Amino acid sequence: MSLSKKRKLESGDSGGAGAGGEGAEEENGGEQEAAPPRPRRTKSERDQLYYECYSDVSVHEEMIADQVRTEAYRLGILKNWAALRGKTVLDVGAGTGILSIFCAQAGARRVYAVEASAIWQQAREVVRLNGLEDRVHVLPGPVETVELPERVDAIVSEWMGYGLLHESMLSSVLHARTKWLKEGGLLLPASAELFVAPISDQMLEWRLGFWSQVKQHYGVDMSCMESFATRCLMGHSEIVVQDLSGEDVLARPQRFAQLELARAGLEQELEAGVGGRFRCSCYGSAPLHGFAVWFQVTFPGGDSEKPLVLSTSPFHPATHWKQALLYLNEPVPVEQDTDISGEITLLPSPDNPRRLRILLRYKVGDHEEKTKDFAMED
C-alpha cells in the first residue's frame, strides 16, 4: 500500500535529506532567522498518525482502483488455492478486507484480517456483506500487539510503499512472520526486487526549456529563468514520485537488491540499509536528469503455475506506485555508450523511520564521482 502524496504521512516532523548530500543552496541573498526546531514525535505518536491516514476512504479507493495491483493480488492468491484450501491465513494491514476475501474465495478455512486504522469497521461490514463473517475475522489493532488464537499457514500483505520501502510496513510483516507463521508457511508475495536506471525526463526537459520559448509567443525574453527553474525543479533532495515511460529510460535497468521475505535477518538488513552497486551504458545522446527506482514483487505460482510478478516498471502498465525519481542538481549531457556507475542504498530516515531515505553515489563518464542524499517528503 502507499499513501497518496496529497496525504501527509506525518504532521509536525521535519523532513528532508541528511546533511551529507548535494542539496539545493539558499539563493535569496539574505540571512533568515532560523525557525525553532519542531519537537520530535515519539514512535507511538508517529504510528498513530500513520494509521489515521488509512482511516479515510481516498487511499483505499486509490489502491483498489489500481487494477494492476488488485488483479495481481487476486490472481496471486487464487493461483495458490491448493496451499490455502482448508488453511489459516493472516492478512497484515487488511484495510477494507478485499485481500482477506480473496483468500476465503481461494478456500482458506480461517482468515485473520488485522487492521490498525479505524477502517477495520468498514472491513467488517464488507466481510458481512459478502457472507464471510464465519471465515474472515477482522481484528482491530497493530499486528505487533494483536493476539491470534493460533499460528497460521500463510501470510498475505500489501505492504509496499513508494520506492518499495516508504512507510516501513515490511517490518510489521516480518514481525508477523516470526511470531505467527508456521515453519515453511506461505508468504504472499514471497520476494521483492529493486531496480535503478538513468533517465532523461521528457516532461522535466520541456519545463526547463519553457522559459526560452516565452519570447517566441509573447515577445518577452525570459530565458534567464531557465537556471532558476533548474534549481527549483532539480536542486532539491526530495524523492519525486512520478510516472515515466520507457522512452525516458537512458540505459538497461539494473537490479540492485533482492529481498526474500522468508530470509532470516531481513529485519536487520532493512535497518542498516538495502542496496547495491550498478553500472550501465547509455543508449544514445540526451540530457541525464537523474535516476528512477522501481520494484517488482513475486507471488509463488502454486504446484504447476509460473510465479506471478507485479511490476512497477515504466515499461509495464502504470500503477499507483509510479516510480521514485532521484534528480541530479542539473542535467548532465551523455552520449551513446557513456558509462554510468554508482551505488544506491535505501534506509529509514533518522527523524522518522517510516519515511524513506535514499543515498546515491554516481559517476557519469569521465566526470568526478558525486553523492546526493534524498528523502521522501510529506
Swiss-Prot record:
It comes from Mus musculus (Mouse). One of its GO terms (molecular function) is histone binding. The keyword Magnesium does not apply. Residues 13-22 have a biased composition (Gly residues). S-adenosyl-L-methionine binds at H60, R69, G93, E115, E144. Disruption phenotype: Embryonic fibroblasts from mutant mice display growth defects, premature senescence and increased levels of TP53 and multiple TP53 targets. In liver, knockdown disrupts the formation of a cAMP-mediated transcription complex involving CRTC2, reduces the expression of genes encoding gluconeogenic factors and decreases glucose output in primary hepatocytes, it also restores euglycemia in insulin-resistant mice. Residues 47-377 form the SAM-dependent MTase PRMT-type domain. Interacts with (and methylates) HIV-1 Tat, Rev and Nucleocapsid protein p7 (NC). Interacts with EPB41L3 and NCOA1. The keyword 4Fe-4S does not apply. It catalyses: L-arginyl-[protein] + 2 S-adenosyl-L-methionine = N(omega),N(omega)-dimethyl-L-arginyl-[protein] + 2 S-adenosyl-L-homocysteine + 2 H(+). Arginine methyltransferase that can catalyze the formation of both omega-N monomethylarginine (MMA) and asymmetrical dimethylarginine (aDMA), with a strong preference for the formation of aDMA. Preferentially methylates arginyl residues present in a glycine and arginine-rich domain and displays preference for monomethylated substrates. Specifically mediates the asymmetric dimethylation of histone H3 'Arg-2' to form H3R2me2a. H3R2me2a represents a specific tag for epigenetic transcriptional repression and is mutually exclusive with methylation on histone H3 'Lys-4' (H3K4me2 and H3K4me3). Automethylation enhances its stability. It is an enzyme of class 2 (transferase). PANTHER family: PROTEIN ARGININE N-METHYLTRANSFERASE (PTHR11006), PROTEIN ARGININE N-METHYLTRANSFERASE 6 (PTHR11006:SF73). One of its GO terms (biological process) is negative regulation of DNA-templated transcription. This is Protein arginine N-methyltransferase 6. Belongs to the class I-like SAM-binding methyltransferase superfamily. Protein arginine N-methyltransferase family. PRMT6 subfamily. Its EC number is 2.1.1.319.
